[in-house]
Amino acid sequence: MTYIKGNTGKWEYVIGLEIHAQISSKSKLFSGSSTTFAAMPNSQVSYVDAAMPGMLPVLNKHCVHQAIKTGLALKAQINKYSVFDRKNYFYADLPQGYQISQFYYPIVQNGTMKILTSTGDLKTIRINRLHLEQDAGKSIHDQSPHYSFIDLNRAGIGLMEIVTEPDISSPEEAAEFVKKLRSLLRYIGSCDGDMEKGSMRCDANISVRRSGEPLGIRCEIKNINSIRNIIKAIEFEAKRQVDLIESGGIVIQETRLFNADSGETRTIRLKEEAIDYRYFPDPDLLPLIISDELINKLKANLPELPDQKIEKYMKEFGLSKYDAEVIVADESVAEYFEQAANECNPKMLTNWLTSELFGQLNKASIGISKCKITPSNFAKLIKLIENDTISGKIAKTVFEIMFETGKAPDKIVEEKGLVQVSDNNVLNTVIDEVITENPKSVEDYRSGKEKLFSFFVGQIMKKTGGKANPILVNQLLKEKLGS
């Protein structure tokens, strides 16, 4: 359990999340308008999106299927009967004057997702519901000192709002949940999870309490746009509430906004209750009826999910749970790994993948899909190390050339003359030279200064251009020095 340290003792975090995930679909939830990101403002707006009189919404079947698949992946109940409601409020980028959502009868309920806690234990986070709704447009305030502008390209794009129970007990758990959910959505293809583009947004409901006490008054932090900011926003808001209570104040139920630059939250408005939105069934849309046949068909076509892959990697490839989770977190990395792991030692591959390759990808700010090294060539590099053709040190040089050029490792080794020296006669000759050239060091070593052993190894590596087999060098050198 993670606690907040106050002046009067420890306080507990109580956190629930609302994730707004834009559905991966070529058209909007209730119209045929395109959903292409960053198009010219107001170029993807139909009469339905603009709320022109007499225009009726038509439900996008693909969006419904995406929601069902997501619900199945979350081990949730798919409701065969659900209803679209009007959520009434006025805002400039909501031309209808209401948002079409699902309040009373959502499409998905009662799901779960397990996350790994800081102690290494698995914790189940309950998911209250997943419902379908349409996104609002976008208000732009920084283009003019006198006017605000409205872009309706986003208006009507399908959203899945995924709401957890208040089961999350630390900022790190919240971040872990969002990371795992994002990975899951990407695997099934229902959302690309790009928080920078706003296709996945997070609201956090936060309250604090003493251990064993009832739930406190919560505040909602809106539109947190990165994993890092989830942690920062929750930490700040929880500490703000603790300081307020300890100084004799009262937490007001309100909606707040996190400022990433200052690291603080500020009040936007008092928190609304459901009654304020005057929900009622949308008269333009029939209830959504889902058949068992459709649910079973979508379930049968689900891809292998992250938790299933983790179990497979541990069982088939002998990976640790941690390594398996690191690889599985990104579907494209998992696909790359599987292609290479069938041709080489998977454990050694994992070490190189998570250290050398990830390091170079981060340095170049690219994803694995843009990597010039093919899975097959990566496997060849691992095999060259395994069969002692090259040393680990030389392999790093070869890897860097591969990353820049995409060349096969065996070609690079051949062109650069980097084959590891593993011939006993050749190595003994070099060792004899080093011993002859350093009589004082030999005498000191034999007198008990064993740290000099690494000096001799370094001299041998220098003479062989780093190509000497290090294991063989250690063995032969010890024999020569009589140790």
UniProtKB/Swiss-Prot annotation:
The keyword Nucleotide-binding belongs to this UniProt entry's keyword annotation: yes
One of the record's GO cellular component terms: glutamyl-tRNA(Gln) amidotransferase complex
UniProt GO molecular function: asparaginyl-tRNA synthase (glutamine-hydrolyzing) activity; ATP binding; glutaminyl-tRNA synthase (glutamine-hydrolyzing) activity
Organism: Rickettsia canadensis (strain McKiel)
InterPro entries attached to this UniProt entry: Asn/Gln-tRNA_amidoTrfase_suB/E (IPR017959), Asn/Gln-tRNA_Trfase_suB/E_cat (IPR006075), Asn/Gln_amidotransferase (IPR018027), Asn/Gln_tRNA_amidoTrase-B-like (IPR003789), GatB (IPR004413), GatB_C_1 (IPR042114), GatB_Yqey_C_2 (IPR023168), Gln-tRNA_amidoTrfase_suB_CS (IPR017958)
Reactions catalysed according to its record: L-glutamyl-tRNA(Gln) + L-glutamine + ATP + H2O = L-glutaminyl-tRNA(Gln) + L-glutamate + ADP + phosphate + H(+); L-aspartyl-tRNA(Asn) + L-glutamine + ATP + H2O = L-asparaginyl-tRNA(Asn) + L-glutamate + ADP + phosphate + 2 H(+)
Name by which UniProt lists this protein: Aspartyl/glutamyl-tRNA(Asn/Gln) amidotransferase subunit B
Domain of life of the native organism: Bacteria
Source lineage: Bacteria, Pseudomonadati, Pseudomonadota, Alphaproteobacteria, Rickettsiales
